Amino acid sequence: MTPHINAPAGAFADVVLMPGDPLRAKYIAETFLENAQEVTNIRNMLGYTGTYKGRKISVMGHGMGIPSCSIYAKELITEYGVKKIIRVGSCGAVNMDVKIRDVIIGLGACTDSKVNRIRFKDNDFAAIADFGMAQAAVQAAKNKGIDVKVGNLFSADLFYTPDPEMFDVMEKYGILGVEMEAAGIYGVAAEFKAKALTICTVSDHIRTHEQTSAEERQLTFNEMIEIALESVLLGDSL
């Protein structure tokens, strides 16, 4: 047990899917996993372990922002022996080549947060996904006939930015999606010798102001989860 996770030793699989919303974690467990059991619920940050096509997999919420997700990712890795974390969440698009409902695989994550500079002695740290995990996710998407975009995300410290001109800079540098956690999770994984990947669904477009409906989000969210789960199986065979 830790101050933030009340699961017993051995409660988590070596691979954990992590949405921000704990209710999405519950949905994933109930919809996609067999024999799913709740293993933690402190602060209502729900976590479950079950099986997917016979493979033991866990799912747990991580909350909003780098500080929250970093706590859970670190404790899962160092206290529960988790080897791989797949963040599954939503993001906003700033690039006109990206459309709502697109699925993005985040090879890297830029950020305005200073957490990785703190851990990297005030130098820039290239926050990147594990290549094998990204490769497996791309292949899983191809196998299911789902188009994905692969590239850089931007992990923002502020949801309500005071500097909207920054979106112009993001677009110039080819950022595919804006979210709030990937750079932190990649930094934690690097520090503690684990592996991580972020897969996001575009829920809204910052430029066009388009938004997905609740029904549309659910459908595309399911595609993202299927990619993540199938990538775990493919990763086992690589």
From Swiss-Prot:
One of its GO terms (cellular component) is cytosol. The keyword DNA repair does not apply. It is an enzyme of class 2 (transferase). Its EC number is 2.4.2.1. The active site is at D204. It holds the Pfam family PNP_UDP_1. The record marks R217 as: Important for catalytic activity. It catalyses: a purine D-ribonucleoside + phosphate = a purine nucleobase + alpha-D-ribose 1-phosphate; a purine 2'-deoxy-D-ribonucleoside + phosphate = a purine nucleobase + 2-deoxy-alpha-D-ribose 1-phosphate. GO terms for molecular function: purine-nucleoside phosphorylase activity. A purine D-ribonucleoside binds at H4, E179, M180, E181, S203, D204. It comes from the Bacteria. Homohexamer; trimer of homodimers. NCBIfam families: deoD, PRK05819.1, PRK13374.1. This is Purine nucleoside phosphorylase DeoD-type. The lineage of its organism: Bacteria, Pseudomonadati, Pseudomonadota, Gammaproteobacteria, Pasteurellales.
